Amino acid sequence: MKSILLLLIITLLGCSSNMKQEPISKSGIPVINLSEDVSTVPSLLLSEAAEKLEIVPLEMTDESVLSDITEMQVTDHNIWIDHGREFYIYRFSRTGKFLNRIGSIGQGPGEYVNYLTFLVDEDKKEVYIFSTNNGVLVYDFEGGFKKQISDFQTMVGMFSSIYKQYILNDHKFFAIQNFGLYRSVDKDSLWSFVSLDDNFQKKRLFKNPVHVGKEEQIIANRANMDRMVNYWMEYLTSVDIYNGQLTLKYPDTDTIYCYDDATNQLLPQYAIFTDEEKGDYEATHLWFKDRKAFDYFSIFSYYPTKDFVYLIGSKGEEVYTYCYNKKDGSVRLQKRQSAITERDVPWFSFPLRQMKRDFVLDNDLGGGDFTVDSRSSGKYWIDILEPGGDENWIDIDQIKSSTVIDESKKKELIRVLESATEDSNP
């Protein structure tokens, strides 16, 4: 068997209990100050957030030849992979052994043609596939179809936006949408986060507070299904379920919220302060942006841990990784160089500009860098490595020269990387 894909999985510190962080301290909402007394550092260490590092080569069989990974989840006993081509979910053990496929392609009951995403409830041993033609379908871990919990029309009617996310936490479902919109809606229906009941009916809608007062402009600048237009779009809402607590940060806002299940409310957990200029709203939210729009500061995602909150932002072609200390309120900043890429697209006279904003830590547990490609179950961060890939691979020489806490883990990583490089291509 040949191992083509390699996962570095870290378990976050502080995930052994079910204790949830209180949303508001007695002294009020903690403020993460990104403009005062910030210490710039050359690197941020993975060991500050991680309890342990696992090196997992995925077993390749005739039934599990994966070209790449488009979506994945790690649970306590399994690894779940979508590689975006055959529309099945591939189940592996936590050591990387292939177990079975989930899903059934077709037009009949319990079947689907394609799907958008999937979620896993390990307690119930259920996999939820969000199909594009047959609603939400539930399968057991062996791949057997169990039931349909929402039909196609319910799913289509729920959203008015191109960009959507589903979340499963504590056996409860939630949904998120971010514009661009693809159809007109009433401005009161321009929601950003929604809690769902067991039948996927909306329980309570929440708005991104930045949208208030801008609803008519957002709706007017929607995508046009008949012709190409430079519609408005926003970055995805950043969501985390660290230690069982659902938290989120809407794009363009300065608050991290936590969801309170007892009251079905979003409560402020952290306020973010910066005196950086954020730029004109329209210019920074066009699909095809002018180069100058990248010169403004913005926070795109955050990652909570036991002792720290990491925030990922950018200004110009630099990626800013902030590390906020929960105990003393101090903030460290590490800057990395990125690059704005340009791609010509038919029907437009100017290029589509994009920039990667990776969350990268110094892997002092195993060597090299650790890029958080995925996070899962509120307790795992995953770095996906692809032999031969220019972007998703590690320089073995860099690992060999790294200073690490555990030399045996470093040797294991080097051995697995060298083996994968030799054996990956049939």
Where does each model-flagged region fall?
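C-terminal motif of bacterial Sec signal peptides marking the signal peptidase cleavage site
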Residues: 13-14
